[in-house]
Amino acid sequence: MKYINQFMKISKGFLVPSSTIGLNSKTYHYKFPLLSFVREFSNGSYLRESAQNPANLGSQKGSDIFSMLANQKDDSNRQQKEERVKERPRSRISFKKQETMDPSYTLQSMVLRSSLKKVGALCRQIAHKPFYHALLQMKMSDKKISKYIATALVSARENAVREAGLDESTLYVDQIWVGKAKYLKKLITMGRGGRAIERSPRVRVTVVLRDERALLRDLQRRQQRLERKKVWTPLPNRPIYLKSNFFTC
């Protein structure tokens, strides 16, 4: 009886008096929203659980019934979504992700007392060059900061061979860039008792080394991209109709 009363409270907005169905000495008939609710409720697991545990039948609330129905819908939607994801074809791996899959070694140098412009020109000089060619360029350069960049290159080579297992004979500088470090500030005295703060720039150099394996994979990707490209076909030769004697856009 408790279960029937709770069911009546839940469905109060969906039932109207009639002589069709008798519940608790009152007659009601279904509206359309209640009909769908009864169908889902009769097919759910709530009735089976209540039949197994009749003692707990009157302890359930109306909100629990609706929440159980909502959970059943969520579970079915989740299963359908997982099936669609499994059937979906595997997406193509992006070029940036393929670069991270290749073996490489990254090293950041110590803080160097120089400006971004001066070090940036030297880094552009050795970017995408073989390792020993880049090292020779830094050793033969007359710039003061070049010897510190050469030291960073040597340290990167030793760590790349020992830790990353790269081939020393086929190393090349894949990327090299400059980043700003914390500037040094100094209080200086100027004329007529004036003072100012002198800022000395400092930078860090980051170098990425790769070997021949990554270079061959890159060439293979480029070749595959050219092969997938649609072949260009010229337009057919056709006569010009309605030709005018003056220029038209």
UniProtKB/Swiss-Prot annotation:
Transit peptide: first to last position: 1-22
Keyword Transit peptide: yes
Protein name per the record: Large ribosomal subunit protein uL22m
Keywords: Mitochondrion, Ribonucleoprotein, Ribosomal protein, Transit peptide
Function text: Component of the mitochondrial ribosome (mitoribosome), a dedicated translation machinery responsible for the synthesis of mitochondrial genome-encoded proteins, including at least some of the essential transmembrane subunits of the mitochondrial respiratory chain. The mitoribosomes are attached to the mitochondrial inner membrane and translation products are cotranslationally integrated into the membrane.
One Gene Ontology MF term: structural constituent of ribosome
Family in the record: Belongs to the universal ribosomal protein uL22 family.
Top-level taxon in the UniProt lineage: Eukaryota
Oligomer status and interactors: Component of the mitochondrial large ribosomal subunit (mt-LSU). Mature yeast 74S mitochondrial ribosomes consist of a small (37S) and a large (54S) subunit. The 37S small subunit contains a 15S ribosomal RNA (15S mt-rRNA) and at least 32 different proteins. The 54S large subunit contains a 21S rRNA (21S mt-rRNA) and at least 45 different proteins. uL22m forms the wall of the exit tunnel.
GO cellular component entries: cytoplasm; mitochondrial large ribosomal subunit
Source organism of this protein record: Schizosaccharomyces pombe (strain 972 / ATCC 24843) (Fission yeast)
Main location as per UniProt: mitochondrion
Name of encoding gene: mrpl22
Pfam family, one: Ribosomal_L22
Compartments where located: Mitochondrion
